[in-house]
């Protein structure tokens, strides 16, 4: 164990679901009812968070800017053909890489789910009336609080295992799914929820980011080669 370093980390990623609707309780997903319909609009930590000393709910304004800028920095690196890592690398330049903007609705849905303290689990339905929504989750702790950039780097670093020629398959998805959602060319918006809390003398940071339109369709490539 390294003092001041990360003591543990877990990252998970979801394959998308599609649905349409306006009222959250009318939005249908193949695997369950919508998060906001099930838990309501409140972002107050639920009873599942008992035993955790909650320090803050939701990303700060500065963290929101960092989340967007870190995603766009990396997306443009890939789009310009400057990402040398891969299996094999380098990653090809992309012709359809949108810059992401923050979306408060995506962030609210992500925060409602984050505040349920059901760690390492994706919600069953998070779509909006506008589009299907993808999701990345990171969860880390240590003697010092991991910052939001270090969590995003965990997703970014999965590029080392990605073979662009293969695309997304059931076999490789667990290793590369965060990366591919990060650089899904047609995704335009992002919104994230978070919890920072103390437990067993450890400082923990839990981050959920929702993406729209979603990426990570099996059998497809994350972006179009230039």
UniProtKB/Swiss-Prot annotation:
Q: Which UniProt keywords apply?
A: Allergen, Disulfide bond, Secreted, Signal
SMART domains xref list: SCP
Q: What is its main location?
A: secreted
Whether Disulfide bond counts among this entry's keywords is yes
What InterPro entries does its record include?
Allrgn_V5/Tpx1_CS, CAP_dom, CAP_sf, CRISP-related, V5_allergen-like
Q: What Pfam families does this protein's entry cite?
A: CAP
The cysteines covalently paired via disulfide bonds are 25-37, 29-125, 49-117, 192-209
Domain SCP, chain residue ranges per copy: 69-211
Family that this chain belongs to: Belongs to the CRISP family. Venom allergen 5-like subfamily.
PANTHER family assigned = CYSTEINE-RICH SECRETORY PROTEIN-RELATED (PTHR10334)
Q: What is this protein called?
A: Venom allergen 5
- Which organism is this protein's natural source? Polistes exclamans (Paper wasp)
């Amino acid at each position: 164990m390294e003092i001041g370093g990360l003591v543990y980390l877990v990252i998970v990623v979801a394959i998308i679901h599609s649905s349409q609707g306006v009222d959250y309780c009318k939005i249908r997903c193949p695997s369950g009812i919508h998060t906001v319909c099930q838990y309501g609009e409140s972002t107050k930590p639920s009873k599942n968070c008992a035993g955790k000393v909650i320090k803050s709910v939701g990303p700060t304004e500065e963290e929101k800017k960092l989340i967007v800028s870190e995603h766009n920095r990396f997306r443009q690196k890939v789009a310009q053909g400057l990402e040398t890592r891969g299996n094999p690398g380098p990653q090809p330049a992309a012709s359809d890489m949108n810059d992401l903007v923050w979306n408060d609705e995506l962030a609210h849905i992500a925060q409602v789910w984050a505040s349920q303290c059901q760690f390492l689990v994706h919600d069953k339905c998070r779509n909006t009336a506008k589009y299907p929504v993808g999701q990345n989750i990171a969860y880390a702790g240590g003697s010092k609080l991991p910052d939001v950039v270090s969590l995003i780097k965990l997703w970014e670093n999965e590029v080392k295992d990605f073979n662009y020629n293969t695309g997304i398959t059931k076999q490789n998805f667990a290793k590369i799914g965060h990366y591919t959602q990060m650089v899904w060319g047609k995704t335009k918006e992002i919104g994230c929820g978070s919890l920072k809390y103390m437990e067993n003398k450890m400082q923990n940071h839990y981050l959920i980011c929702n993406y729209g339109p979603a990426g990570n369709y099996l059998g497809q490539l994350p972006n179009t080669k230039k």
